[in-house]
């Protein structure tokens, strides 16, 4: 168990940076869920969702975030940030649209409004895949805040390694 005098590990520090974003995470998921971005049926909502995703990833430091043409009519976004010398490239993947549900019954709340029930958040696309998109944003913000503080000469990227990411 950790005592007050025990230094926080890198993973603990990173978790703290994530925990301090809880209001922002909820706000981001609320916004992401609010887009009725149904693949193939709601082009204007998909365009609005793509614009929000583009802005959000640009704000967390991803460069040249842009929409590419796709043969299926979806609006995939791509961005890139060069890794520091000697560091690996990491791919983050998620999507911001949802599949048509043929107006299936079962929702007792508006599916396009994030709703909290018994400590859980519900909203259309929150599990597939808008929640993951928001998790990527939170992780990128946390890494940008935390990594510069934890850099050491022997760990040029702040000691962040795949082991830490997997354990996290």
Say what each PLM segment does.
Residues 4-126, 142-160:
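Acidic/His- and Gly-rich active-site-bordering loop/insert found
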């Amino acid at each position: 168990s950790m005592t007050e005098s025990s230094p926080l590990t890198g993973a603990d520090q990173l978790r703290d940076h994530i925990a301090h974003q809880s209001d922002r995470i909820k706000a981001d998921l609320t916004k992401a869920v609010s887009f009725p971005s149904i693949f193939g049926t709601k082009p204007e909502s998909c365009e609005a969702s793509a614009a929000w995703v583009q802005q959000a990833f640009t704000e967390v430091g991803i460069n040249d975030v842009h929409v590419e043409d796709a043969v299926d009519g979806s609006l995939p976004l791509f961005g890139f940030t060069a890794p520091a010398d000697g560091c690996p490239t990491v791919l983050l993947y998620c999507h911001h649209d949802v599949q048509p549900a043929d107006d299936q019954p079962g929702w007792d709340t508006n599916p396009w409004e994030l709703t909290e029930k018994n400590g859980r958040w519900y909203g259309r696309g929150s599990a597939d895949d808008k929640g993951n998109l928001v998790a990527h944003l939170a992780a990128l913000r946390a890494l940008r805040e935390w990594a510069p503080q934890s850099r050491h000469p022997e760990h040029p990227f702040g000691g962040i390694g795949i082991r830490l990411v997997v354990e996290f």
